[in-house]
Structures are given as C-alpha cells and as structure tokens.
C-alpha cells in the first residue's frame, strides 16, 4: 500500500534526485524562473516552497537548513534578503508552475517554475 508516500522518483536514485532538485532550486533563486519537464517542475515547487518557508523565519537553524540545501551563502543571502520578504504576509504558494507545451525531441510536457510575486 502507498499510504502517506509522497514525492516523485523522477527516474533517479536518491542522491541524483536530491542533486537535481538542489540544482534546479539554485537556478530558480539566481534567475527567477526555470524551464523543465512537468514532473520535475512539480517537485521543484514543493522543494522551493519549503526553502522559502525556512528563509522567512530567519532563525539560525532554518537558515542553516537553507544553506544545507543551496550550498552557497550568496544564494542564501539573496533568498533571505530579497525573495523571502516578498512573501512575508503569504503562507505558502510562493512558486507558480506554468505549462508551456511539449518538448520537440521526445514530446515530454514542459513547464516554467517562477516566483508568484
């Protein structure tokens, strides 16, 4: 039974999946939006929303969790000082997934993930 089992495997082992989500979240913080396949976009939304929730609290433990996932202090600073304050009065829904069509080569559904504000 699959009770309370959530998340997508994305055709990867655990380490590769975590590395993929970290890379996509770094690119989201740097560029403000990322274009990828739809399943990856949906997982990135979950991952990035949790990072913003931690960044909003500004407690030491939460900042260290964000740094653990992003791996770069400059990105943590950008997330906590520029991005998180935009969502001070909002509880969740920090990112938006917009479907953009299908990839030409293999027909995979693609989507753009961007900040909602």
Swiss-Prot record:
Q: Which UniProt keywords apply?
A: Ribonucleoprotein, Ribosomal protein
Q: Which Gene3D superfamilies match?
A: Ribosomal protein L17
Task: Write out the GO cellular component annotations.
Answer: cytosolic large ribosomal subunit
Biological process (GO) annotations held by this record are:
translation
Q: Does the keyword Ribonucleoprotein apply?
A: yes
Superkingdom field: Bacteria
Q: Cross-referenced SUPFAM superfamilies, in alphabetical order?
A: Prokaryotic ribosomal protein L17 (SSF64263)
User: Under the GO molecular function aspect, what terms does this record hold?
Assistant: structural constituent of ribosome
Q: Which residues cross the membrane?
A: none
Record note on quaternary structure: Part of the 50S ribosomal subunit. Contacts protein L32.
HAMAP family in the record: Ribosomal_bL17 (MF_01368)
Write out the similarity annotation: Belongs to the bacterial ribosomal protein bL17 family.
PANTHER family attached to this UniProt entry: LARGE RIBOSOMAL SUBUNIT PROTEIN BL17M (PTHR14413:SF16), RIBOSOMAL PROTEIN L17 (PTHR14413)
**Protein name in UniProt:** Large ribosomal subunit protein bL17
